[in-house]
């Protein structure tokens, strides 16, 4: 299924000249004669649109991946944005670049981005660099019995020790989780225009939807479709998942898609807690309608509580990746050819989540348990209801299984 993007209205922000900060800032000569900046990045290496760290020249100017991807999407799709403030003077910096698409595109052009340089064909992107230094040190305390199989009898004393094998296996598994997470975000056009997948902003940035602008149903359906596509793409890019029999891959994806979608929606701050699709229906005297009202109210309340718990814990990207793996690898799923392998992957995911939580949140000894307790709440709203609410308008009567299979094959 190919969905066409819908240009979303920007949030209302206080009008301010985007160049005011740059005009008022006086640069002082730096060690390399390039001037210094409070961000610690040389001005010549900053994104000329938002001031974030530049990843090189894009379409004629130094720009970050976020702004270059936004410009490419806008030009290729001939998107037309409207500044809701109306003045066309919204601030465009690292903190506010996602708030007004019209002003962001305007600043891209003013900064010198060349529309003619945007190629019609899809250009390959360089493989993202994954930093795993911290994970290397975290494997020191990893329980080998859960991470690596026992060494066979008669192993040469010069061969790898069980502990070194455990470290290598654990390191590889965590690397594959994060690489899959990165690959699912490499092409910004696979995600909604208002979800900056290359951003280094906090885990829960300001939602692209605000209470001052309507949370349009078309926008929610569009974003939902893209989040589901990202979830499928994440699974496809997970080497340990691809190593399973193809039938097992399909069965696991059909079983877990709704949980993967909800995790992605929470991670990228889709406003599920205020989504009009989840608003309880109007009360009715009929008993059946009253029952549906009660169920819808319960689902909405549980979802709001779940989102609040995720935000209270400030779940980080690595934890999200591990939690996605936990909901994907369910050995109890019926029809699996190799449930033992799936169970081993589930154990790996749990060990990685535990070790990461202990290493990065040592002051929260119960954090791992709290993260695990979040997962059952994702299944409170059934997959059938999520399909009805978020995807029925987009896919019509097409079975979700067929949609997932098409996404997976393509």
UniProtKB/Swiss-Prot annotation:
NR C4-type Zn finger ranges: 47-67, 83-108
GO CC, alphabetical: nucleoplasm; nucleus; transcription regulator complex
A Pfam family it matches: Hormone_recep
Compositionally biased region (Low complexity): 153-162
Lineage: superkingdom: Eukaryota
Entry keyword set: Disease variant, DNA-binding, Isopeptide bond, Metal-binding, Nucleus, Receptor, Repressor, Retinitis pigmentosa, Sensory transduction, Transcription, Transcription regulation, Ubl conjugation, Vision, Zinc, Zinc-finger
Region: Disordered, residue numbers: 118-162, 193-215
Outcome, altering residue 309 to G: In ESCS; impairs protein folding and stability
Signal peptide: none
Numbered residues of crosslink Glycyl lysine isopeptide (Lys-Gly) (interchain with G-Cter in SUMO): 185, 330, 337
Cell location: Nucleus
Disease: Enhanced S cone syndrome: Autosomal recessive retinopathy in which patients have increased sensitivity to blue light; perception of blue light is mediated by what is normally the least populous cone photoreceptor subtype, the S (short wavelength, blue) cones. ESCS is also associated with visual loss, with night blindness occurring from early in life, varying degrees of L (long, red)- and M (middle, green)-cone vision, and retinal degeneration. Retinitis pigmentosa 37: A retinal dystrophy belonging to the group of pigmentary retinopathies. Retinitis pigmentosa is characterized by retinal pigment deposits visible on fundus examination and primary loss of rod photoreceptor cells followed by secondary loss of cone photoreceptors. Patients typically have night vision blindness and loss of midperipheral visual field. As their condition progresses, they lose their far peripheral visual field and eventually central vision as well.
Known function: Orphan nuclear receptor of retinal photoreceptor cells. Transcriptional factor that is an activator of rod development and repressor of cone development. Binds the promoter region of a number of rod- and cone-specific genes, including rhodopsin, M- and S-opsin and rod-specific phosphodiesterase beta subunit. Enhances rhodopsin expression. Represses M- and S-cone opsin expression.
Subunit structure comment from the entry: Homodimer. Interacts with PIAS3; the interaction sumoylates NR2E3 and promotes repression of cone-specific gene transcription and activation of rod-specific genes. Component of a complex that includes NR2E3, NRL, CRX and NR1D1. Interacts with NR1D1. Interacts (via the DNA-binding domain) with CRX (via its DNA binding domain); the interaction represses S- and M-cone opsin expression. Interacts with SAMD7.
Protein name as catalogued: Photoreceptor-specific nuclear receptor
Organism (species): Homo sapiens
Organism ancestry: Eukaryota, Metazoa, Chordata, Craniata, Vertebrata
Gene that specifies this protein: NR2E3
